[in-house]
Amino acid sequence: MQVLVRDNNVDQALKALKKKMQREGIFREMKLRGHYEKPSEKKAREKAEAVRRARKLARKKLQREGLLPSKPKPVFGADRGRGAAGGAGGAPRPAR
């Protein structure tokens, strides 16, 4: 894998290299190969990953078709759903 270093900017080249390695899945593979994985464990992990992918695809498809609401966007700002008061909100907590 190669990355060009422009104007002796090593930080930018390292950032580009890290991004390429992330896209290629090298970090994930290094993590998996860090220890021995029994064939039965590998098979179970791969099966679980496939199930997760299938569920994610099905969920995305339902969201596109409008049958499933998409995740609500996070609210940034002062209010954040605390009501009009903006404080702790609600009734005071009972003493223990």
From Swiss-Prot:
What organism does the UniProt record list as the source? Afipia carboxidovorans (strain ATCC 49405 / DSM 1227 / KCTC 32145 / OM5)
What InterPro entries does the annotation carry? Ribosomal_bS21, Ribosomal_bS21_CS, Ribosomal_bS21_sf
Q: Which residues form the signal peptide?
A: none
Could you state one GO biological process linked to this protein? translation
What's the protein called, per UniProt?
Answer: Small ribosomal subunit protein bS21
GO CC annotation, single = ribosome
Annotated region Disordered: where? 37-96
Gene Ontology molecular function? structural constituent of ribosome
Family note: Belongs to the bacterial ribosomal protein bS21 family.
Q: Where is the composition biased (Basic residues)?
A: 53-62
